[in-house]
Every structure is written in structure tokens, then in C-alpha cells.
Amino acid sequence: MWLELVLASLLGFVIYWFVSRDKEETLPLGDGWWGPGSKPSAKEDESIRPFKVETSDEEIKDLHQRIDRFRASPPLEGSRFHYGFNSNYMKKVVSYWRNEFDWRKQVEILNQYPHFKTKIEGLDIHFIHVKPPQLPSGRTPKPLLMVHGWPGSFYEFYKIIPLLTDPKSHGLSDEHVFEVICPSIPGYGYSEASSKKGLNSVATARIFYKLMTRLGFQKFYIQGGDWGSLICTNMAQMVPNHVKGLHLNMAFISRSFYTMTPLLGQRFGRFLGYTEKDIELLYPYKEKVFYSIMRESGYLHIQATKPDTVGCALNDSPVGLAAYILEKFSTWTKSEYRELEDGGLERKFSLDDLLVNIMIYWTTGTIVSSQRYYKENLGQGIMVHKHEGMKVFVPTGFSAFPSELLHAPEKWVKVKYPKLISYSYMERGGHFAAFEEPKLLAQDIRKFVSLAELQ
């Protein structure tokens, strides 16, 4: 017992020394050109143009013909979702997609919010911009940039947007009313893909910062999960004076002494200040971290090395694309869904919502360019980019959803984000928080902004 206390005290001192070395620095803003060919000498067109999602008979006919040629491989007996997407359940998805899913109706739903495009660094950047339908007298809306990840899209935010822009109509306080901007990452959905190598999270952060200033915002809030978390983090590192607050539901925590401490075992976890909830979500460590990462990172290795190869297959087969993406919406929502014959997909999402996200990738042909984002960010290795070793010095809020791929305790988050002012253990939910639990996420964003406004 005494030995454990002494060791824990020594570890605590080392951790305190490590955490207290707060060096405030900013990420260089830089510039870039990602369009085809050389950057033209003429000034880039900075106009903002309305955009509408459209479809055609030819597009739908081609989709149906490809779906009709779906060739299923029988799953192994009792395999459920342990081998990936179960082809027996895929038959149900395919039948619904072919016979009941109404893409024209879904296009109308996509167009319920105003869409725009604008040229930034040689690329046509797509975004939706939703203003409050009503405001309390004498109040102005708070601008909020929300950034998606992979294999999601701007559509993930469709259910949370009204809770932020029109809270009173949805039973929430109108103390904070937001003006929401949701861009598509370059190479995702309706944003043009780069013609050149190297467009990573830092370049995306700069592009989205330019978008916000082009829209007239000098100070704003930002929120993200998955790649959106890293993009927003980079923006906070790059232009901290413009970011009023950063809210995340996933953290890219660089390897540090602190993140290694759970290896000491569950008993030391309590000595080191981990809460009971942290211990519940981290242990058994081998199963919940090591084995989980091994099971769920196969796609990452492919996309961070040779994304174009698998992309050839996915861009040619809508059913293959659906299997590849929807498997993530199963396991990343809750890992236990691997035990179910249908992957639990319809427990949290409708088939319409899931297929709209697939259709955004399919109709734009952007699965390959979206996968390349892994190569651009991870292809050179880990801890080789300047931003990975930098801390973030803007007010930060964090939503810890219990079924996220890897739990990030408050102590880990605070190492990277010393100005963490809000950390919430969420009641339920997984990786696709805005899509799965929009009300819970909206409430936590509002809680964080209330604290950030006092800073």
C-alpha cells in the first residue's frame, strides 16, 4: 500500500511538471493553392454563390441498375457483424434502397437549408449557412462553425441545427441563439477535391477560417468531432484571437506520459485522479483500448497508405460503398452492436438518414478523395506535424460520449487544452454525436458557451 502511494506521488509530480509547461504559441497561417495547375496571377473570385442539390432521372436509373447487380456472399453462421457488414442484413438495406427510398424527396429535404459555394485557395467550397428565424429583442446570434468527419458529411448536423438556431421552438432556452455554418471538407460531398497532394487538417482549418472571415465573422465559436475535432483544434492553434470558444466531442490526444498511466492498472487509476466513470470506460484496458483499436483500425491503415486502390471498388459499387460506410455507423455508435444480426443500425438511425449520407458520397463520387484525407494527415507518421505537439489556449468544452471509440478522460484532454472550462460525461451516445444525440450535444454546447461568455 505504502509503495503504491509513494509511486503514485512520484508519478503525480512528474505529471504536474509535464502539464505545467504551458508554452503559448500559434500555428503559422500560411497559404495554399489546391486547384489544378499553377495559381493564376489574377485575384481569386471571392463571391458567394447560392447552390442547390440536384438529381436527374439518369442518376437514379444508373443507381438502380448498379443496385440490381448486387452479388451477395453468404455470411458465416453466427458471425453477426463480427466479420464486417452482414450480407443478410444488406439484402434488407438494398431492397429498401431500391424500392422505397425516395432520393428526389431527400434532395428536397437537403435543400431545406440554404446552401452556398465559394472559391478558396483554388477550390469550390460548399457550406450551409442557417440563420435564426427569430431573435429575442436586442440580441444578436452567435456564429458557430460545425465541422464533420469521415464517413459523415454536413448532413450529420441537420437535426441539431434547429436546436441551435431556434431553441425556443424546440423547448430550449433562448439565452444563446446561434447562426450555424456547416462546410463540407474539401473532397467530401459538394466541396471540390484537391488536385494536389498535401491538403490536410491544417490547410482545411485555414480554408474554413477564410470562409468565416469572408462571411464577415471576426470572432466565432467552433465545434467538431472526428476530423472536425482536429480541424477545429488546428484553427484554434492558428487564429486563437478569432476563436471565442472550441467545443469538441472527440479529442486527438497526442501520446504523452499521462496517456500511458492507465497501463499501471486500475488501482493506480484511482490514485492518479481518474474518476469512477473514467475507470468504467477505460478498463479492462486491454479490451477497451488495445483490442478495440486493433479491431477498428483496419480501414485507417488502408486509407492512410493506398486509399485509391480500395476507392476504385467503392466508387464503382453503391452497395459496396454502403457496406463500407454503414459498418462504421454500426460499430462506432456502440461497439456491442457487433453482436447483432442487423448491427443495431436502426436502433439510432432511420434507413433514410443513413442512405442520404451514402448518397452524398455516391452522387458526388467523393469516396476516394475523402479517403485520401487519411493519407494527407497520417501518411507521414504520428508526431511529425508541428500542431501535434502544440497546446490549445482558447476556452474549450468537451462532451465525453460513453460509446466513443476511445474514452478521453478530463485529465488527458486538459494536457492538450489547458483552458478546458467544461467537461461533460454524456448520458449516452457514440461517435456520431450530432447525428445520434442532437439534443444532448446541443445542450452541452449551450452549457459550454454560457461559461465561455464569462471568460
UniProtKB/Swiss-Prot annotation:
Q: Give the residue spans that cross the bilayer.
A: 1-21
Q: Which residues form the active site?
A: D226, Y374, H431
Where in or outside the cell it occurs: the entry states: Microsome membrane; Endoplasmic reticulum membrane
Quote the protein name from its UniProt record: Epoxide hydrolase 1
Q: How does it sit in the membrane?
A: Single-pass type III membrane protein
Known consequence of changing E404D? Increases catalytic activity
Q: Name one GO biological process term.
A: hydrocarbon catabolic process
As stated in the Swiss-Prot or TrEMBL entry, residues carrying the post-translational modification N6-acetyllysine are: K439
